[in-house]
């Protein structure tokens, strides 16, 4: 079959269980596509062909013996921030260019236990700090919809791989929008779960109180299948929450859009820099949800102006602490011929970290320094609580909150030169991480240049099933999620 890459996760699972095709055939199909198409997209950092075929053969044996799970034999790609035993894990940085993890991240462990086949590791912004996937040490990834544009970030490789049909779905992480924004830029569905829903064990840390892993795929249904595998408590992660996990696939029709109250924050639709096409597509999608029976309720989120300064104090502060472990001594990049220990530290870090990482470490170290700790970091944590309370107050009157996932569509590679401008572009996504809430991106159309636009729905704590269900029903009534970039239509 030449069009296996066009099948949904459900269709792939059915095809494998009914022996219409084998996991080896499916895996070989994707590996051929990667070999032919990825040199243009540059989504993969490492392709694990031999391991993938071994895993596919094991999956076929399990399917034959009747020992399969719902997803046995289906391939996926992992963001290169998840530790993978015996496979290079670089986090997009020269600092970890030769790091091979001795263990699997819990998310990777769970996908293996479910019989999923690892195609490889995909590109990302260095240490997940960025929203373009240009800061990666191995170079930029291209957006399959327009190869001279960025796919978003930091999970840009995950988004590009799925959008180019080089993987049926992928894992991502989201610290300030790193699943939702690239999903928006590449026309995909991406879910950022509640903080503590998915284990962070084995994810290379950026900002520990903000990082969360989640699925990226074409549809809410496809995301639900992966959530069923990766969600749940993990004793190895102290921030993982002991809470019963929903069957996200079974609950896809569990929330009725009829009577659903969708909050429309006044402040969100008056943000400077909100593109007219993005605003129009988001408003059209809300009108569609209204036609399906939802009620739109105007709400106030008065802390909106505080999002960016609060986030860009807390996230860099946590990053400067987390990244202090990379010193050229135990592992990671080590400079050549250091004059002394201080020279080893200085040069290993200045040569091993890229400019954006160094910028955020400097901001974070400054915010945590003795004279400024109370004025900056402590104050930012207090404002963070106010942002959380702002959302909780809104949820007293609405079920979900709607917003664009990004103020613009994807921009050209090399165009994002001003870091402050880039930080301001995170306005719609970062508050969700500050508050620890779940949120989802759904594709809702295109701008005048045929670049995808995304709608973001933000839910209350533990409402992943509700968000997936709403988007699933929206996708039953629209076809934006089925649209494919021209490069994805190519056959290997």
Swiss-Prot record:
Key words of the record: ATP-binding, Ligase, Nucleotide-binding, Protein biosynthesis
Active site feature: 79, 154, 178
InterPro entries for this protein: Amidase, Amidase_CS, Amidase_dom, AS_sf, GatA
GO biological process: translation
GO cellular component, one term: glutamyl-tRNA(Gln) amidotransferase complex
EC number of the protein: 6.3.5.7
GO terms of molecular function: ATP binding; glutaminyl-tRNA synthase (glutamine-hydrolyzing) activity
PROSITE patterns: AMIDASES
Pfam families, per the entry: Amidase
Superkingdom field: Bacteria
Catalysed conversion reaction: L-glutamyl-tRNA(Gln) + L-glutamine + ATP + H2O = L-glutaminyl-tRNA(Gln) + L-glutamate + ADP + phosphate + H(+)
Entry-linked PANTHER family: GLUTAMYL-TRNA(GLN) AMIDOTRANSFERASE SUBUNIT A, TRANSAMIDASE
Quaternary structure annotation from Swiss-Prot or TrEMBL: Heterotrimer of A, B and C subunits.
Similarity remark: Belongs to the amidase family. GatA subfamily.
Record-linked HAMAP family: GatA (MF_00120)
Job of this protein: Allows the formation of correctly charged Gln-tRNA(Gln) through the transamidation of misacylated Glu-tRNA(Gln) in organisms which lack glutaminyl-tRNA synthetase. The reaction takes place in the presence of glutamine and ATP through an activated gamma-phospho-Glu-tRNA(Gln).
Protein name (Swiss-Prot/TrEMBL): Glutamyl-tRNA(Gln) amidotransferase subunit A
Organism whose genome encodes this protein: Acinetobacter baumannii (strain ATCC 17978 / DSM 105126 / CIP 53.77 / LMG 1025 / NCDC KC755 / 5377)
Lineage: Bacteria, Pseudomonadati, Pseudomonadota, Gammaproteobacteria, Moraxellales
């Amino acid at each position: 079959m030449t069009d296996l890459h066009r099948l949904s996760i459900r269709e792939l699972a059915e095809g494998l269980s009914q022996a219409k095709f084998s996991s080896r055939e499916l895996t070989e199909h994707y590996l051929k596509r990667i070999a032919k198409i990825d040199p243009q997209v540059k989504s993969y950092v490492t392709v694990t062909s031999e391991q993938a075929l071994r895993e596919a053969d094991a999956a076929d044996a399990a399917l034959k013996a009747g020992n399969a799970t719902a997803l046995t034999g289906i391939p996926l790609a992992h963001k290169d921030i998840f530790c993978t035993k015996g496979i290079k894990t670089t986090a997009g940085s020269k600092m970890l260019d030769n790091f091979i993890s001795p263990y699997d991240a819990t998310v990777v462990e769970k996908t293996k236990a479910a019989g999923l086949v690892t195609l490889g590791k995909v590109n990302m912004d260095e240490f997940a700090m960025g929203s373009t996937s240009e800061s990666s040490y191995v170079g930029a990834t291209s957006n399959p919809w327009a190869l001279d544009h960025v796919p978003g970030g930091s999970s840009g490789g995950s988004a590009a791989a799925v959008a180019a049909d080089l993987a049926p779905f992928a894992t991502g992480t989201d610290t300030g929008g790193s699943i939702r924004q690239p999903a928006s830029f590449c026309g995909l569905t991406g879910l950022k779960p509640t903080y503590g829903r998915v284990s962070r064990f084995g994810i290379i840390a950026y900002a520990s109180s903000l990082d969360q892993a989640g699925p990226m795929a074409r549809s809410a249904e496809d995301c639900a299948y992966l959530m069923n595998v990766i969600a749940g408590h993990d004793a190895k992660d102290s921030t993982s929450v002991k809470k019963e996990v929903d069957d996200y696939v079974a609950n896809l029709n569990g929330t009725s859009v009829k009577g659903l109250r969708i909050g429309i924050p006044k402040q969100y639709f008056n943000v400077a820099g909100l593109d007219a096409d993005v605003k129009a597509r988001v408003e059209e999608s809300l009108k569609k949800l209204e036609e399906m029976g939802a009620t739109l309720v105007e709400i106030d989120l008065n802390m909106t102006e505080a999002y960016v300064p609060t986030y860009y104090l807390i996230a860099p502060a946590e990053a400067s602490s987390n990244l202090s472990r990379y010193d050229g001594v135990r592992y990671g990049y080590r400079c050549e011929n250091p004059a002394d220990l201080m020279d080893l530290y200085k040069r290993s870090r200045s040569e091993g970290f890229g400019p954006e990482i160094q910028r955020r470490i400097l901001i974070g170290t400054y915010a945590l320094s003795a004279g400024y700790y109370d004025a900056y970091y402590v104050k930012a944590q207090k404002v963070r609580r106010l942002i959380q309370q702002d959302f909780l107050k809104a949820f007293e009157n609405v079920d979900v909150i709607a917003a664009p996932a990004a103020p613009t569509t994807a921009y050209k590679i090399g165009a994002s030169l001003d870091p402050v401008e880039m930080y301001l572009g995170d306005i719609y996504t970062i508050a969700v991480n500050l508050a620890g809430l779940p949120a989802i991106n759904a594709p809702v159309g295109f701008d005048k240049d045929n670049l995808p636009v995304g709608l973001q729905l933000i839910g209350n704590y533990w409402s992943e099933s509700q968000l997936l269900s709403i988007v699933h029903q929206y996708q039953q009534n629209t076809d934006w999620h089925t649209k494919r970039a021209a490069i994805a239509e190519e056959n290997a």
